Design a protein with these regions (language model features):
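Membrane-topology segments of multi-pass transport proteins
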Residues: 1-16, 20-28, 34-299, 555-557
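Transmembrane-helix boundary motif in ABC transporter permease subunits
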Residues: 318-350, 363, 540-549
């Protein structure tokens, strides 16, 4: 036994077990958030229960001989000691737990909450009626009901409702796309022109160069733009009017008839009539909508495309900033600076910077970048916009710079380690052939150190992509009205605020009023953030591997 311990075999098993536990933990975490997130888009069946007794639910009472329609959201087990006396009497002697159902009943405008919690013993066996539909709305959440009629102005269709509704939904979708196109392509452009005219006038006033001819020309252009705006408003009002006048009449679980305007209906489906291929197609459609649409209902519904775009774009801008700074700093420290007390202090400071909490970088970015540099830029280049700030307020540029400072130590350390691994004989050979130190560095050393530089980029992306705390101070918002990139000059707007997947997770998980409904969305967004980070890292790793193979013959590896 002692010989076996002295051989080192136990430590091999110990390290192997630690690696296995780490891998299982990571895979288990990914499976958990992946399963809970991706099942959010699966069309869950609608159940119907008959209430068999007076059932208290969240301060209210479900009366006998009524039906309950909903989706089973969660099952939990309640110990016997936690149950009311009447519920304990219904338990068998050998039963120590009762099953509690968390049921989503939707229909938010009719009931005080989307969810109710009830003991399963107080309900009879559920059925899955095929006539009940799930209606997805632009506001108000989902609606569960039976289609009764479709109202087209004065006409009321009570037969072949689905055919009429499908046609009207297609027409409504076409009108929505046309309205969105006019708003994005023309309305925003006209608003931008009006703002530019106002700023141009303000700039001339500040420079004391206002003339009567300029004022007349400015007024004429303003009136022309306002006329175009008035025409566009009339066109938009006409399109919106075409959406009104239609309504779907639906019966809810109490037997009441509810009128839902067509303009509020996004989609509908019968989950209990779907086959497995239908459910798979519906799941894929919902996943695509999640990835490609904007959020709605205070981020608790809809898609996350602005957050995906903001996250990826922020990482790209951060990488563009941090890579030159980190590489140049590492080159100076390794190739040019003397090994004295000053450079040793710099290296110690760089290493210690990696341990500073991220929120401290956020405070630094807010105080230095936003309030100092940003305010100075506004005073010099955007005086006509004051007192409204342009760069003197949190935005994408300051967020990227803050994350660049946050990840700078990682890039410096990995790049310097890569430069250290290059054999000195390579440098001496280049210098012996007549190359200068800069030519040796540019044509020989840096290409061979590229894999290490890309490794620094990978670590920087992995560290920065999921950071939220500093971004809350320097640019991220709950909902951004515009993307940082659009068709208006200068096309890339680094002064704009943006959305981020990490902050979106925090906002949906802790800031929404309907936390039960938003919980699956938290898992889905978390899984998406992990996927985005892994995708960015795999891209950088593939580039590094290609470069490593390219310079392998030079003895780099």
């Amino acid at each position: 036994m002692l010989n076996w311990i002295r051989s080192g075999a136990p430590w091999i098993w110990l390290t192997g077990g630690a690696v296995s536990i780490s891998l299982l933990s990571v895979l288990g975490l990914l499976l958990l958030i992946g399963w809970k997130g991706l099942t959010y888009f699966w069309p869950a069946p609608l159940y119907q229960w008959n209430v068999t007794s007076l059932t208290p639910v969240q301060g209210e009472v479900l009366h006998e001989n009524t039906i309950l329609i909903g989706q089973i959201y969660e099952r939990s087990f309640v110990p016997r000691s936690y149950l009311p006396v009447d519920a304990v009497k219904k338990l068998d002697e050998d039963e120590d737990f009762a099953t509690r159902l968390n049921i989503k009943i939707a229909n938010r405008e009719l009931y005080p909450a989307d969810f109710i919690s009830v003991l399963q013993m107080q309900l009879d066996e559920p059925t899955t009626p095929k006539e009940w539909a799930v209606i997805e709305r632009s506001s108000g959440g989902y609606f569960f009901g039976k289609l009764v009629a479709f109202q087209d102005g004065d006409k009321l269709y009570q037969t072949d409702i689905q055919t009429v509704l499908n046609k009207k939904l297609d027409d409504a979708e076409t009108l929505r796309h046309e309205i969105d196109s006019l708003v994005v392509d023309q309305l925003k452009d006209l608003g931008w022109k009006l703002e530019q005219l106002r700023l141009d006038k303000r700039k001339h006033e500040l420079n004391n160069t206002v003339t009567d001819d300029f004022l007349a020309q400015n007024l004429q252009q303003k009136e022309q733009v306002e006329q175009e705006l008035a025409k566009l408003d009339l066109q938009l009002d006409g399109l919106r009017l075409q959406l009104s006048g239609y309504a779907l009449i639906v019966e809810d679980m109490t037997g009441s008839h509810v009128s839902i305007p067509l303009e509020d209906i996004l989609d509908y489906w019968y989950p209990n009539q779907m086959s497995l291929p239908d459910k798979v197609m519906h799941w894929g459609k919902q996943v695509w909508k999640f990835l490609s649409e904007d959020p709605r209902e205070s981020n608790s519904e809809g898609g996350v495309f602005p957050a995906i775009f903001g996250t990826v774009f922020l990482v790209l801008i951060m990488s563009i900033i941090v890579m030159p700074l980190g590489v140049v700093a590492a080159i100076y420290l390794h190739e040019y600076a003397k090994n004295n007390a000053f450079t040793r202090i710099i290296r110690i400071a760089v290493i210690n910077l990696a341990g500073v909490p991220s929120i401290v970088y956020g405070v630094f970015g807010l105080g230095f970048f936003v309030y100092t540099i940003g305010a100075s830029i506004d005073n010099v280049f955007y005086a006509e916009r004051l007192p409204a700030p342009t760069f003197g307020t949190p935005g994408l540029l300051w967020s990227a710079l803050t994350l660049a400072v946050f990840t700078l130590p990682v890039v410096i350390v990995t790049t310097e380690e890569g430069l250290t691994r290059i054999p000195s004989s390579v440098r001496h050979g280049s210098l012996a052939l007549g190359a200068t130190q800069f030519e040796t560095l540019w044509r020989v050393v840096l290409p061979m150190a590229t894999p290490a530089i890309i490794t620094g980029l990978i670590l920087a992306i992995a560290r920065a992509a999921g950071e939220v705390a500093p971004l809350m101070l320097v640019g991220v918002v709950k909902l951004a009205s515009s993307l940082p990139v659009d068709g208006q000059f200068p096309y890339v707007h680094l002064d704009r605020k943006f959305m981020h997947l990490g902050f979106h997770i925090y906002d949906v998980g802790f800031q929404t009023s309907n936390i039960e409904a938003a919980r699956p969305l938290v898992y889905a967004t978390s899984f998406l953030l992990v996927t985005v980070i892994v995708g960015l890292n795999l891209t950088a790793i593939s580039i590094r591997n290609n470069l490593r193979e390219k310079y392998r013959t030079l003895g780099q590896d």
